[in-house]
Amino acid sequence: MQIFVKTLTGKTITLEVEPSDTIENVKAKIQDKEGIPPDQQRLIFAGKQLEDGRTLSDYNIQKESTLHLVLRLRGGMQIFVKTLTGKTITLEVEPSDTIENVKAKIQDKEGIPPDQQRLIFAGKQLEDGRTLSDYNIQKESTLHLVLRLRGGMQIFVKTLTGKTITLEVEPSDTIENVKAKIQDKEGIPPDQQRLIFAGKQLEDGRTLSDYNIQKESTLHLVLRLRGGMQIFVKTLTGKTITLEVEPSDTIENVKAKIQDKEGIPPDQQRLIFAGKQLEDGRTLSDYNIQKESTLHLVLRLRGGMQIFVKTLTGKTITLEVEPSDTIENVKAKIQDKEGIPPDQQRLIFAGKQLEDGRTLSDYNIQKESTLHLVLRLRGGMQIFVKTLTGKTITLEVEPSDTIENVKAKIQDKEGIPPDQQRLIFAGKQLEDGRTLSDYNIQKESTLHLVLRLRGGMQIFVKTLTGKTITLEVEPSDTIENVKAKIQDKEGIPPDQQRLIFAGKQLEDGRTLSDYNIQKESTLHLVLRLRGGMQIFVKTLTGKTITLEVEPSDTIENVKAKIQDKEGIPPDQQRLIFAGKQLEDGRTLSDYNIQKESTLHLVLRLRGGMQIFVKTLTGKTITLEVEPSDTIENVKAKIQDKEGIPPDQQRLIFAGKQLEDGRTLSDYNIQKESTLHLVLRLRGGMQIFVKTLTGKTITLEVEPSDTIENVKAKIQDKEGIPPDQQRLIFAGKQLEDGRTLSDYNIQKESTLHLVLRLRGGMQIFVKTLTGKTITLEVEPSVNTKKVKQEDTRTFLTTVSRKSPSCACSWV
C-alpha cells in the first residue's frame, strides 16, 4: 500500500509499504529517498511517536495515511520528574517530545500507566498533545508527577460576597491548579487569591488531599489586597521593629525579615503573640495577626522548661528543654546524663514512639510532662514489605513497634496514607494496636502490603451440594479472611475449606485481587476430607522418602515436608512428576498425584544463568533462570519484574513463539540468550480453516501469530502433524515464519488446508464450470518432455473424475 510522510518544511514523500513493515523499515525507506539517517528521524501518527520495533498495523496505519516526520535534534536533554514521595526520576528527552511521550517514558521506568499520571510544571498541569518546548521546559527542568486518583470530585468555593463557585477537581490537584480553575471561571488572577479551609490558608504547592479536602467540601476565597500590612515586633530590650508583611506570610518568613533587619538568626528567635509561641510553618492569618499587631521577640535562651524521663528500672531523669527541641536533642541530653547512646534510646509519650526529627511541641509535650525511656536492643531488625506491584520496601523496626508505627514508616517511604494500608503476614491481616512481636514477626520477615480499595463488592461461593453463598468482600481481602466469612455464615472451619477459582486452589495468604477475582465472581468450595495419603519422593541418589500428604497440599507444602525430613531448603528443590516440573502454588490433585505416586526430586544447582528479555519499546530485562525453568516460570518472573500478566505475554526466540509447558533447555536457550517479548493484544480474532473434505475448523488466533503457530493449533484440534499441512490463502501458500498480519489475514478470513502426502504431491485442475479437482500425482521424471500417452492418461483420469471437464489434446 502507499502512505505519505509529511516533513516540517511541508514536503510530502510517498512510500510503498506493507502493514507488516516495522517503523524501522519505514525509516530506512525514508533514508533511501531523502538521505536522513534513521536515528535522526521521529515519526508521528495520530499525535503519537512511533516506536521502531512496532509495525504499521500495530498503529492501525492504513493505505494513504499520513505520517509526520520530525527531525531529532542531536543530543536531546535531561529532565527530572519528582514524585510526591520525593523520588526523582531522570529522563532523556527532546524539546519536541509530547507530554504523552514523556508519560510513556515514565511508564517504562516506573510502571505507572499514562492515564494515572498528571505532570505539573510551573504550577500548570501539562496536556498530552503539547510538547516540552510548548511549555518552555528546558534541560534539567523538574516536573512534578501527581498520581491521578480515579474519579474526580466536586468542591465549592465561597467568596466574601456570598457567591458559590462549583469546581471539578481531583484529590491530587494542587492549590495552584485550583486557583487556575477559579481564574478560568471568575477571571481573578491566582496571585490575588487566598484559599482558606478549616481555618487554614492553603499553600500553592500542596494538594487537596494533603488538606483532607473531600468531595463537596467548601473552600473560602479571600482576595489578597495589594501591598500587605505593617506589624510590630517588640524585643525584651524595649526596641520595636516595623515589618511589611502579608497575612499569608509564614512565621518562618517573618523570622527571615527580622534577621534581615536585626541580624538575629531565625533559630535563636522565638515569637510570641497573645501568649502563644508561634510555629514556623503556620501563617500570620492562622494566628489572627492583623495590621499593626505587636509580636514579642524572645531570644532562645538555653533552658526553657523541665520534663521528666522515666526508665524501665523506675529511675526518673529531669531534663531542661525547650518546646522547639527535637527528639534527637532530647536523646543527646539523656546521653549526657546517663551515657546511653541515642541509637539505643526509644522515647514514648502518650503511647506513641517519638521520631527523631520531630519537636517536643509537635507532640504537645509541655512542662513537667513525663516521657518513658525504653532501651533499643542493639540494631533492632530489618523487615521487608512487598507490594502487589512486586516492589519490596526495607524497614528498620523493633519487635515492640506497633503495626501503626510500621504503617507510619511506610507512609514516610512511599507516601501511602496509613488508612489505605492493609498489612498481611502468614495470611493474617495485622491490627494497628498490636506489635510485631505479638505476631511473631522476626528479622527479615516479609509482610505483604495491600491497598485498601474503597467500596467493597459481592462474590458468590458455590458448594458441591449446589448451594450458593453470597459474601461482602474487598479485593484486598485474603483467602483466609474469605474462609472466616464462610465460617461465620456456614459454620465450616477454615482448615476444612478449599476454595477453587478458574481451576486453581486459592492460597490463604493471597488476596482476591491477586487472583483477579472481581465483583460477582463465583468461587467453588470443596471440603477437605480428613485422612490424607502416602506418596514417595525419589532422589537422584536413589533414596526414597515417604511423605504423609493430602491431595489439597500445595507443592510448596510438600517441599516444606521434604525440608523437615531431609534438611533441603525448598528453593533448592525441584519436583518432577509425569515428566513435568511442579509449580509451588499448585496442589497435588491439580497434577492428579494419587496415593503411592512417586515424585522425583532434583536439586536446583546454585547460580543458574542469566537471560535477557527485550520488549518492543527497546527495554531489556535481565532474568535469573535455570535451563529447566518452564516458559510459564519465565513469564511469572517477568510479571514479578514488570507487572505484565502472563496471559498477555508472548515470548519469541529464534523466530519461534515459546510454549508455556516447555523448558528453556527444550529450545536450546543458553546463558545470555535474548528472548523477545511481544504483548498479546486483548481479544484476538477467529479465523476458519477449510479442509479438502469440506470440514471447517474454527481457530482463535492473533494477527501476530506465525503460520507455524496456526499449524500447531490445527494439530491440537485435528491431530495432523504440521509437516503434513500446507495452508493456502488468496492463492498463496503460507510460509511458517511469517505472521497472519504479514498476509493481511483478518478476522473471519478462511484459509485452505491441503495435506502434504509423503513422496508424492497434489495438483489442482480447474474446470470450465469453475469446479476445482484435487489430484494426487508424482513429479514426472523428465519434466522437459511429457509423453503423449502420459498426457492422454492424465486427461482421461481428469475426464473420469469430472465428465463436465472440457479436455482435449493434439
Curated annotation (Swiss-Prot):
Residue positions, PTM Phosphoserine: 65, 141
Keywords: ADP-ribosylation, Cytoplasm, Isopeptide bond, Membrane, Mitochondrion, Mitochondrion outer membrane, Nucleus, Phosphoprotein, Repeat, Ubl conjugation
GO terms, molecular function: protein tag activity; structural constituent of ribosome; ubiquitin protein ligase binding
Gene3D superfamilies, alphabetized: Phosphatidylinositol 3-kinase Catalytic Subunit, Chain A, domain 1 (3.10.20.90)
ADP-ribosylglycine modification, residue list: 76
Transmembrane intervals: none
Sites marked Interacts with activating enzyme: 130, 148
GO annotation, cellular component aspect: cytoplasm; mitochondrial outer membrane; nucleus
One Pfam family in the UniProt entry: ubiquitin
Site (Essential for function): 144
Covalent link Glycyl lysine isopeptide (Lys-Gly) (interchain with G-Cter in ubiquitin), residues: 6, 11, 27, 29, 33, 48, 63
PANTHER family noted in UniProt: UBIQUITIN
Family statement: Belongs to the ubiquitin family.
Domain of life assignment: Eukaryota
Organism annotation: Rattus norvegicus
Any one of the GO BP annotations: ubiquitin-dependent protein catabolic process
Cross-link type Glycyl lysine isopeptide (Gly-Lys) (interchain with K-? in acceptor proteins), residue numbers: 76
Miscellaneous section: Ubiquitin is encoded by 4 different genes. Uba52 and Rps27a genes code for a single copy of ubiquitin fused to the ribosomal proteins eL40 and eS31, respectively. UBB and UBC genes code for a polyubiquitin precursor with exact head to tail repeats, the number of repeats differ between species and strains. For the sake of clarity sequence features are annotated only for the first chain, and are not repeated for each of the following chains.
Listed name of the protein: Polyubiquitin-C
Residue ranges occupied by any Ubiquitin-like domain in the UniProt entry: 1-76, 77-152, 153-228, 229-304, 305-380, 381-456, 457-532, 533-608, 609-684, 685-760
